[in-house]
């Protein structure tokens, strides 16, 4: 069966400007959250990625009028109907689990297929389930393919998350906005995307305090009205381009960026020796090799993002000594290691840590096992001698808007082919 691949002839310097898209991890929660509104919602600054299109079509399955036009989405929930969503759309996208919290909040009932997304090892939704049960939902998990959630009424509760989880924090917020009384989420995730979703819900009339801290309080309200809302810039897309620019950038200017959101990466790149200029809403990066070796450990926000662990790895082949990368969030997130070895990289991983030594990369045929592994392989392809062919590019398109066109505009020798 024919499939699209991305090809890169490495060694070309990057120069120019890139506009960073809206945050994927905000958009995939805010789009389901629109179904909580009574009336019309307008979202601006959406990333133009396949995950957004999938979620919009899930809204349409609930008889919601949804018009997606580039970065803008208009939603009208006037004719909304509760319908089961156990279908292949849900399986293709992990963030479809936000439909659970939103539908539970709106209808007190939902039937939904089990979510999919990137295969990153264990990513259970047990904390989501724990939160829904605390709010009064009964959950039927007897089916292998779908889950049924029903609540006679939703009541505020004190919920302590056993592990910090962005998904669970947001999903419980969605379910709790209409619950009677006050809900408290302790050990809540502090990520900018959590704050963004809370700000969106508040723009519709929700009563939420403490988003961005470890304790979030939600006082249930009867009704949420429509609103207009602009999504924050994508810190992971920004970080991925920062890594590509540090690898091959003569001078790359990134616009629509919140420097505070990428602080952990910026500090690590400066440790490496990258030349970085930071302004209000833009960052300028110039390559400055050879780089110093560094150690990286992923942590929850504001620590180093697990989503940037893979994109930064190719830079560590350009250093003077060995570097160590440890992923404490998803210890199984090292499927890119084998692909980099195919390119001649001196890299090994074991039990959540990769050891990376200076290496010369050569073009090869490689497979993107997940979204951020795809960004890693693109960066590796930009550095490598010869042509790199990346298969399984659907993962890359799930999270990066027009990445091939952006890199081409910066001067990369990159193109797509059908094979």
Curated annotation (Swiss-Prot):
Its EC number is 2.5.1.7. HAMAP family: MurA (MF_00111). One of its GO terms (molecular function) is UDP-N-acetylglucosamine 1-carboxyvinyltransferase activity. The active site is at 118 (proton donor). The keyword Transferase applies. Phosphoenolpyruvate binds at residues 24-25. It holds the Pfam family EPSP_synthase. The modification 2-(S-cysteinyl)pyruvic acid O-phosphothioketal is found at residue 118. This is UDP-N-acetylglucosamine 1-carboxyvinyltransferase 2.
């Amino acid at each position: 069966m024919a499939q699209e691949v991305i090809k890169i002839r490495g060694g070309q310097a990057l120069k120019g400007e890139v506009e960073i898209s809206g945050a994927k991890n905000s958009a995939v929660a805010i789009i389901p959250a629109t179904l909580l509104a009574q009336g019309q919602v307008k979202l601006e600054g959406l990333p133009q990625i396949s995950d957004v299109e999938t979620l919009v079509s899930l809204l349409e399955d609930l008889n919601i009028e949804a018009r997606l036009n580039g970065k803008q989405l208009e939603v009208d929930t006037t004719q909304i109907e509760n319908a089961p969503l156990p279908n292949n759309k849900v399986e293709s996208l992990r963030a479809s689990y936000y439909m659970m919290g939103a539908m539970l909040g709106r209808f007190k009932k939902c039937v939904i297929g089990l979510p999919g997304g990137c295969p990153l090892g264990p990513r259970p939704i047990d904390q989501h389930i724990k939160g829904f049960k605390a709010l009064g939902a009964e959950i039927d998990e007897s089916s292998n393919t779908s889950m049924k959630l029903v609540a006679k009424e939703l009541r505020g509760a004190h919920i302590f998350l056993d592990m910090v989880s962005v998904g669970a924090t947001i999903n419980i917020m969605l379910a709790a906005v209409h619950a009677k009384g006050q809900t408290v989420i302790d050990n809540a995730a502090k990520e900018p995307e959590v704050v963004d979703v809370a700000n969106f819900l508040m723009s519709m009339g929700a009563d939420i305090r403490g988003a961005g801290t470890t304790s979030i309080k939600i006082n249930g309200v009867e009704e949420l009205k429509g609103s207009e809302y602009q999504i924050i810039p994508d810190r992971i897309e920004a970080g991925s381009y920062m890594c590509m620019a540090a690898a091959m950038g003569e001078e790359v200017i990134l616009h629509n960026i919140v420097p505070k959101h990428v602080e952990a990466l910026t500090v690590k790149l400066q440790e490496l020796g990258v030349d970085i200029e930071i302004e209000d809403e833009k960052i300028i990066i110039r390559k400055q090799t050879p780089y110093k070796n560094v150690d990286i450990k992923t942590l929850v926000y504001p620590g180093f993002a697990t989503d940037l662990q893979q994109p930064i790895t190719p830079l560590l082949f350009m250093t003077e000594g060995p570097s160590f990368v440890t992923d404490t969030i998803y210890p199984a997130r090292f499927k890119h290691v084998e692909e980099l070895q195919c390119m001649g990289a001196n890299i090994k991983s074991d039990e959540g840590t990769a050891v990376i030594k200076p290496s010369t990369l050569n073009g090869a045929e490689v497979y993107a096992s997940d979204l951020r592994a795809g960004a890693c392989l693109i960066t590796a392809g930009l550095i490598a001698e010869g042509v790199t062919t990346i298969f399984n590019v659907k993962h890359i398109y799930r999270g990066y808007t027009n990445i091939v066109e952006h890199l081409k505009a910066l001067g990369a020798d990159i193109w797509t082919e059908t094979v």
